[in-house]
Amino acid sequence: LATAADGTMYLLSTTAYSATLYRVEEDETLTAVSKPFSGSMYNPKLVICDGTAYVLYQDYDYISHLCKWNENGQLWEECYVGTKLAQYQDLATDGEQLYFTCTTGSFPYALQAYCYNPNTGQATQIGTDLSGNACNMEIAAADGTVVIGYRDLTANSVPKAAIYNGATWNIITLSEQECGMVSVIAEEDGNFWVLPSGGKNPIFSMSKDGTATAYELPAALQENVFQMVPVLSGGNLYVAVNSQNPNAFDLYRLNQETASWETVGNTIANEIVNQPVLSARNGTIYCMYNASEQILLKKLVISKNEETILKGDLNLDGRRNLADTVLFHRYLLRTVTLTEEQGKRAETVEDGTINIIDLIWLKQVIHLADVVDA
């Protein structure tokens, strides 16, 4: 399950011997957009980059494959094939390039990261190995920054984050507690969320320079989390918490101002779920998961009063700051475009247009906030 930059949502359905890409229509019907893939895709990861669907998967021998659906040629096209066993792997895109991480070889698992350039068709390793033995990692990318959250088996299984800004990896130990899985998600401005599961680990909001802010989980969830599945919608962080407890699989929302959590909507499932994935579009959150030998897709419509629209918050991080003014300047200079959601927030004066007047209003509000804080 993946959502493109234009809001179009796609779903990859796999069987033991085939796979088909579908578009999830506005009425939740599925339209096949690819021919069936011939072969097996194990543990597939789907992303949409510049309108093209890419899938990272493992074959029967746990070798990594990156392929794409070639719309013009109406065929599945292989982009990259690994040469060593890859027990763990994950895929992300910043909208221009693809980034994937994988472990190589049998135990111990060396952790590596690669960048695939769709224009050249070449995949190159990013820097050097991140760890001599790691697992349970995820990767995210935005605004020129790449982050990998992983469980470092060389350091008592603690959660770590590796941040790459185009030069070197900055590796940060997030906690001294053991963790299980580590999930990550990127905001449009290149800031990230890193969510280690297990123990009493908090989750972390991280900036490009590695500065981390911790948010504790509710007491009832501490030491009871198998996996956290994040998604961003309307400037808010939502997390589906998988405890592999048949009593509840719930969705939570973090209130950053109060550092508190609240459940959202009804319980997603009252059974043990596997391979849950979240995606969001147009104020609706979708969850796909495997349970009782079925693949299920459910949705939750976030009401207007729950989705707070913060005027001027162009990068959707829940705050108005210098980063928003920089993005606004770039938009006025026509070096970037805004999504529909960003456009709603850019029209601060509400006169039917987005122009310099809206930017002036934003700068004044930020200045007044700085004066009050001082």
Model-derived regions, located:
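Repeated scaffold domains used in trafficking and secretory/extracellular systems
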Residues: L1-A4, G39-I48, K84-T93, G132-A142, ...
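Entry beta-strands of beta-propeller and related beta-repeat scaffolds
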Residues: G7-L11, G51-V55, E96-F100, G144-I148, ...
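Beta-strand C-termini and the immediately following turn/loop, strongest in propeller blades
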Residues: L12-A16, L56-Y60, T101-S106, G149-T154, ...
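Structural motif
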Residues: Y17-Y22, D61-C67, F107-Y114, A155-A161, ...
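Short loop/beta submotifs within extracellular cysteine-rich repeat domains
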Residues: A19, L30-T31, I63-S64, L75-W76, ...
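Trp- and S/T/G-rich repeat-edge/linker motifs of beta-rich repeat architectures
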Residues: T20-G39, K68-K84, C115-S131, I163-Q177, ...
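Blade-level signature of beta-propeller repeat domains, shared across WD40, Kelch, NHL, RCC1
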Residues: I272-E306
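Cellulosome-associated attachment modules in secreted, modular CAZymes
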Residues: N305-A374
